[in-house]
Amino acid sequence: MQDHDGLIARYLAVWNETDAATRRDLIALTWVEEARYLDPMLSAEGTDGIDAMVQAVHERFPGHRFRRTGAADAHHDRLRFGWELAPEDGGPPEVRGVDFATVAPDGRLASVTGFFDAAQG
């Protein structure tokens, strides 16, 4: 049985980690080497591409954190969960969305496709 909550927590920890070395370690625990990510604004292939993409988001949204919203849905090798990106010190989220993931046989992420529900400005 998959630990979907643990996988989602690691996935969000990747997005929130500002230390590059720690983030790369988290990526290796969370994503398969040939992983793919796609949302309306970003795309990345491979763990190096995912690391570069996350760093770019940190540069665009300094002082912000991703957090999960609500329960996850899962079946077979698929996973769906909501999230939001908001300032660490409170305030309304900049972006809300839902991610759909494919989980590899080893329990790591093979792919994530993100959709935005709402974005500020």
Where are these regions (language model features)?
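A beta-strand edge to alpha-helix "cap/lid" segment located at domain peripheries
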Residues: 2, 16, 52, 58-121
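Hydrophobic alpha-helical core bundles mediating ligand binding, dimerization, or RNAP-core interactions
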Residues: 8-11, 31, 54, 81-83
